[in-house]
Amino acid sequence: MKEPKNLPKTSSGQLGDFLAQVKKTPSRIQRESVGRLVFGMDATASREKTWDNACQIQSKMFRATDDIGAINVQLCYYRGFNEFQCSGWSSSGEELIKEMTNVSCLGGHTQIAKIFKHALEEHRTQKIRALVFVGDALEENADELCYLAGKFGVFNIPIFMFQEGNSNAVMSTFKQVALLSGGAYAPFNSGSVKELQDLLSSVAVFVAGGHKALEKFEKSDRGREILTLQLRK
């Protein structure tokens, strides 16, 4: 799949809207000492160019929660012909990065519903606090994804949808999924990886410590506070 030309960078307004949505998301911090986050990714051929960036993003997510408490992350990805893989739960960014570097992208159809269904099964075993999905395409039934997203909403598990590229059809469904689950949506491309890292770090902090931790995180240094103020304009 060829990469679309002239992809728009993520705008300040869009990033600000995303952070505002995160702040509105109900916090599920209860007695669990460690928040659990399912991190789903599209590993089909079209995402090969940006896969390496995902490793850096994972590392930053873990560092962002150092002062709050650990998070446990499970990596799930699909690729090729009906291949769907999940890692074990890990609180080590290095372990997940090592696993991700051993993954090569392969052409195939999207399997987003499998990630959603798997996350719901994990939740039935032990509560998860959020699901993150990063992808650029949608080749399955949008109504089914929205139905599953509604289940996440019932269980109060927000889905944070990150879209690479500018497909309007993908954007429409990703936004609906985020809305139905009580989560949030944000687009990105190769020119806005830094912003994506910051947003995913914010999600990780939210999972680890809730709204108060997120607010403190955004004000933890002047550079981050300035960025946040710019995003909310």
Residue ranges and their predicted role:
Residues 1-38, 45-52, 67-69:
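Acidic, polar low-complexity linker/tail segments
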Residues 32-88, 92-134, 138-143, 165-175:
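Von Willebrand factor
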Residues 39-44, 128-140, 163-165, 182:
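DG-centered beta-turn motif at the end of beta-strands
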Residues 61-64, 147-155:
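Catalytic-core regions built around general acid/base machinery
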Residues 129-130, 154-160:
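Short, surface-exposed connector motifs at secondary-structure boundaries
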Residues 155, 173, 180-181:
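Short, structured coil segments at secondary-structure junctions
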Residues 181, 185-233:
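C-terminal "exit" segments of structured domains
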